[in-house]
Amino acid sequence: MESIERYSSLPSGAPRNFIQGSYDQLSSTSRVLHPEEIVEPLGFHYRNDMIMDFLPGVDLFTGQQIMVPAALALFRYSPKAPAVNPFAFHHTNGLASGNVEEEAICHSLCEVIERDAMSLAELRASAIPFHFLKHIMNSLKAKGYPISAISADTFKDDPGIFPDVDISEIEFEPAKDMANKFSNAGIPLIIKDITSTVGIPTFNASSIEWVTHDYGYLAEGHGTHPDSRIALLRAITEVSQTRAANIQGARDDLRKINYGQDNTDDKRAWQFMPSKNTIKFSEVRTYFNEDILEDIKLLLDHLKGDGLATAIIVNLTNPEIGIPVVRAVVPGLETFKITKSVMGHRAKRYFKIE
């Protein structure tokens, strides 16, 4: 399914009826998503009179059509002049497929909520505390105090912000079986509850397996779903997938272990360090629905309840393949985990220096 997602999301993956024009031109007659409404880094200074390619999407809150910059909907999109692409990155966040369109929509919404939670967790436990420390150091230096520099590769994250989740008593057999495989292999598995203020269960799963005294496999996975059991299973299966890819060496974007003595990620990265707080899996809020439409409604209600008023779906289905593929775009959700470069209003709530 993932290969179908990727192919269908390419500019050449299906017939594309681009609507070309500037924001100023199109917004006079249509609803248009402005590039600055979303949390994405721009590659250059954007102006509203710049020509771009757009694709039609649907706002799930209103049912109305909204024009979306093609660069946000498609993967590896490069415009032809005179159109421009102001965005600095391309990625697959919010891209999902399903047996039916409703399933694809549910998966896509869960993914953007998951990436938002991941971004906020990374910022709160690592990036923002490091910035605070650097700010304090620079202030002391400016006052003439002799302060030694601290580098990012020696900074220790805060592992106590997000609780570890005890899954020893879980009764959901698929997740229980997966966790037992780690236990039987002697590989530690750490589960953290990183659910954001959106309120949809989200977990971070991690493992470190030392092969020798200075070589090991480090893996991380995430999962989000209204049903906390499914969210947990997704996180564990993703960390398993990452481990397999790491062992195989088939990707070039996997996280590397710093092999310096006493400076490995299991001693300084929040995802891999035990938390001071532990909760039972049964304490995590969960939602059970028999109809996937009810799951979608729940996701939308939670987004709206957290101040996110627009949720756009762009249909990217290739008619020859016939497998529903969509891209979800929710203005306001964070993407720092992907881009490592920008923060939106949700992240900035935690970024205050008195």
Predicted features along the sequence, with ranges:
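Helix-biased "structured C-terminal domain" signature
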Residues: M1-E354
